[in-house]
């Protein structure tokens, strides 16, 4: 299967959300991680009620974690321009000049089992994040033929997942998504792992 299907999926998703660019990744949390690494972030602000993998990034990346009481809907800001939009599914909802991370995990509206996408503004950001997701390389050139200049993290979406996304996309666009509420997640600050 060709990696061209990933580009097609990225283009259709960016068009749906109204974003100039979209970088397909293996999961939403890894998309957020790539954005934090790319922007060299030293602190994230995380709602007490969200999915647990987001605050775990602070430990993984050795950055500061600040909890916030926030009743959020569809998305929230980790930094001034990095957004966890894991549950967002609304046309033309991209917020300009941000990095929005959307999930395609099996419980999400476009349920692919696993997967995510980073919505972004510029070609420069797209290329940098794409390379980071592909072991530091350009996906269109065999890696042995490249002088790789940046670290990468092997977080790319597989062509099979992208094809599944294309196959399910029209139905996802036609159907109303679940409206998640903040109490769908527990208060993470009460968990032992965050009291250490």
Language-model region placement:
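A structural motif shared across PLP-dependent enzymes of the aminotransferase-like
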Residues: 1-8, 71, 167
């Amino acid at each position: 299967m060709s990696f061209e299907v990933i580009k097609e999926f990225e283009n259709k998703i960016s068009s749906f959300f109204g974003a100039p660019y979209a970088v397909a990744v293996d999961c939403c949390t890894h998309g957020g991680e790539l954005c934090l690494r790319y922007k060299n972030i030293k602190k994230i602000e995380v709602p007490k009620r969200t999915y647990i993998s987001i605050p775990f990034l602070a430990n993984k990346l050795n950055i500061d974690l600040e909890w916030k009481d926030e009743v959020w809907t569809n998305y929230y800001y980790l930094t001034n321009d990095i957004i966890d939009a894991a549950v967002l599914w609304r046309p033309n909802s991209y917020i300009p000049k941000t990095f929005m991370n959307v999930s395609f995990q099996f419980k999400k509206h476009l349920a692919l089992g696993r997967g995510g996408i980073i919505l972004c503004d510029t070609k420069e950001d797209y290329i940098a994040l794409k390379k980071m997701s592909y072991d530091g390389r350009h996906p269109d050139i065999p890696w042995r033929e490249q002088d790789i200049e940046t670290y990468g993290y092997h977080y790319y979406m597989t062509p099979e997942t992208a094809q599944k996304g294309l196959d399910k996309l029209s139905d996802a666009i036609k159907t109303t998504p679940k409206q998640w509420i903040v109490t769908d997640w527990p208060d993470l600050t009460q968990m032992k792992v965050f009291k250490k």
